[in-house]
């Protein structure tokens, strides 16, 4: 059983985690025509904006209510109203996603009531724009909680409720024996709730696989449509591409919901409660066994076998496992990231024969931590990782871990958010057959490149010992 060690320091050394509002903003950016709005000071928004721009290398439409000292003391309802109306007038977004910060959450204002009053007072002016509130205080949780809360807020406040009529046994039997191509298209819709740790490339690959089974994936949020680096024909003041508001409204028409990552359990449960759509939680899509189970799930939903292309990708992964497993046996790995991504990579490396000697994460609220294949998990920062990673063969974390890697003399595999000292990080594959294959090659190459070649003297000594034996 893994031992979870809570942080006992009074200060954070080289922070590991990003805040809840940032996670919520990333989720809102996966909706077409959206603008995330930080309800807080300009500094909070500027810091998050810098991280997003450096990671994605794109313009990010992140806005703020610009709370000052007076508004912080007397209340920020006027600032919130002014910001919403200004955004509607200047950008006409389809969605304004409000992310609260610690500055306003500490005052304990009733934001839901304030937004309801704004919507009622300015109903005509705000027509055609959804205003969604996600409570995301900086002092609680981390990036993955913010992402999940934003997705749950969109489902709660946008998705249409649906009272499902009980289906007869005869109707159920007909659905099972009818070919998917003969069933109504709306019955082939599958809602997919990806976790924050899936990259743009991961979501594109995920969509291709689901479509390969004749299903229609509705991905919420879909950052592969908005943060994939495409250049629009004209300047866009909002998120360009992503999930449409109409698709979020019609999530209740899906035959199944697939949530990826433990932190997406609550949004999936909420969707099931509101619409009756049953959900399946997939804790990881990395590794041969996990992907096999996912492919079997898609085959069960669609009633069709896996396409030949998927079998070929699986065969490529098997070959990569044969080629790469020699480089991982007995290797010591140190990982620091959010809980679900920690589980994803820890199980990936231990499946290759490596050992997790140091596991550091941002928050102890997730149940997935108890399943991490390590002796202990430290809730802490990159300073804790540096203290615990002595003797490791590979350090696995985001770009802020590069200084620790240099001081320890350990190679660094960059994952998560932010990655600002490498290009194309958003297109990196980490899931399904091809993503697992690419991770094996990348990690093995990093380990190989940092293993010194034996000198001539060492080779001669080995030959002498062999001949003497």
UniProtKB/Swiss-Prot annotation:
Keywords: Metal-binding, Nitrogen fixation, Plasmid. GO terms for biological process: nitrogen fixation; protein-containing complex assembly. The keyword Metal-binding applies. Pathway: Cofactor biosynthesis; Fe-Mo cofactor biosynthesis. PANTHER family: LIGHT-INDEPENDENT PROTOCHLOROPHYLLIDE REDUCTASE SUBUNIT B. NCBIfam families: nifN. This is Nitrogenase iron-molybdenum cofactor biosynthesis protein NifN. It comes from Sinorhizobium fredii (strain NBRC 101917 / NGR234). The lineage of its organism: Bacteria, Pseudomonadati, Pseudomonadota, Alphaproteobacteria, Hyphomicrobiales.
């Amino acid at each position: 059983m893994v031992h979870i060690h809570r942080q006992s320091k009074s200060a954070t050394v080289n922070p590991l985690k990003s805040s809840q509002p940032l996670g919520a903003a990333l989720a809102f950016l996966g909706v077409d025509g959206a603008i995330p709005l930080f309800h807080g000071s300009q500094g909070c928004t500027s810091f998050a904006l810098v991280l997003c721009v450096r990671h994605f290398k794109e313009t990010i439409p992140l806005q703020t209510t610009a709370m000052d000292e007076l508004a912080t003391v007397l209340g920020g309802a006027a600032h919130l109203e002014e910001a919403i109306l200004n955004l509607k007038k200047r950008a006409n977004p389809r969605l304004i996603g409000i992310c609260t910060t610690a500055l306003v959450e500490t005052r304990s204002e009733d934001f839901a009531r304030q937004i309801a009053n704004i919507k009622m007072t300015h109903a005509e002016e705000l027509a055609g724009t959804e205003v969604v509130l996600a409570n995301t205080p900086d002092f609680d949780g981390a990036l993955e909680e913010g992402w999940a809360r934003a997705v749950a807020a969109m489902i709660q406040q946008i998705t249409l409720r649906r009272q499902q009529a009980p289906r007869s046994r005869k109707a159920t039997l007909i659905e099972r024996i009818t070919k998917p191509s003969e069933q109504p298209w709306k019955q082939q819709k599958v809602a997919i709730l990806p976790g924050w740790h899936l990259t743009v490339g991961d979501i594109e690959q995920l969509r291709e696989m689901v479509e390969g089974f004749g299903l229609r994936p509705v991905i919420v949020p879909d950052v592969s449509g908005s943060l994939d680096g495409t250049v629009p024909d004209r300047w866009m003041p909002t998120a360009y591409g992503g999930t449409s508001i109409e698709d979020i409204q019609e999530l209740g028409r899906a035959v199944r919901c697939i949530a990826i990552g433990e932190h997406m359990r609550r949004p999936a449960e909420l969707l099931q409660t509101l619409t009756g759509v049953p959900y399946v939680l997939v804790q990881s899509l990395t590794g041969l066994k996990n992907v096999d189970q996912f492919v079997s799930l898609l085959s069960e939903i669609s009633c069709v076998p896996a396409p030949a292309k998927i079998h070929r990708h699986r065969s490529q992964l098997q070959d990569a496992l044969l080629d790469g497993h020699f480089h991982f046996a007995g290797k010591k790995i140190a990982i620091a990231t959010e809980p679900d991504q920690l589980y994803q990579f820890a199980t990936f490396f231990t499946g290759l024969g490596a050992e997790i000697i140091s596991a550091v994460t941002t928050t102890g609220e997730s149940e997935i931590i108890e399943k991490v294949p390590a002796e202990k998990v430290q809730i802490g920062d990159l300073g804790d990782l540096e203290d615990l990673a002595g003797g490791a063969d590979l350090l696995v974390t985001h770009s802020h871990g590069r200084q620790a890697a240099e001081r320890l003399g350990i190679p660094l595999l960059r994952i998560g958010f932010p990655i600002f000292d490498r290009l194309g990080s958003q297109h990196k594959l980490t899931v399904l057959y091809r993503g697992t294959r690419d991770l094996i090659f990348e990690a093995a190459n990093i380990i190989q490149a940092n293993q010194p070649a034996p000198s001539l003297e060492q080779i001669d000594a080995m030959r002498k010992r062999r001949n003497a034996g």
